[in-house]
Amino acid sequence: VFTPRVLADLPQDAKMATGHVRYATSGQRTRANAQPMVLHHCKGAMAICHNGNLTNAPQLRHKLEMNGSIFHGTSDTEVIGYLLTQNRLISPDIETAVCRTMEQIVGAYSLVIMTHTKLIAARDPNGFRPLCIGQLPDGSGWAFASESCALDAVGARFVRDVLPGEIVVADYTCLLYTSPSPRDA
């Protein structure tokens, strides 16, 4: 729980952070299914927070397992993580990998992905799951949350909702938007 004490104890020089409260909609309540889920690969590391359900998770999981992925949990987040990792290995940047992953997954979801230099928010093409953008005080940074009231915990001002199918990228200097590309979920 992000109490004022917990927030005060966080490193004050940190440039980025991610957190997530997950209730079991799919997968078991185990440490292996805890979020954010951190994945390491040859192009770096990323933390993934996911809200929602994939309707094609069993098929994607089977395909990933047949290609050598070893699952430690039972969540849709792990499926997304392995897809994203595979796509990152063949993509010039994380944004392209997220686009490719979104083309493969079907369902209702919102994602927040953190790398060492970027914070990425993505919303399913139909906008079934909420996701919003907030700006930190004095324009000092950005925040993403599934509920606008969560922005209050970090003192962020609500800017707008992430559009259906949209990917929003925040780095140390700016906030970038991609054009929404809706498709049927």
What are these regions (language model features)?
Residues 33-59, 98-147, 160, 166-167:
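Conserved catalytic micro-motifs used in adenylation/nucleotidyl-transfer and phosphoryl/amide-
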Residues 89-96:
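Short, charged, surface-exposed loops that flank catalytic or proteolytic processing sites
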Residues 148-156:
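A conserved acidic, glycine/proline-rich C-terminal tail/linker
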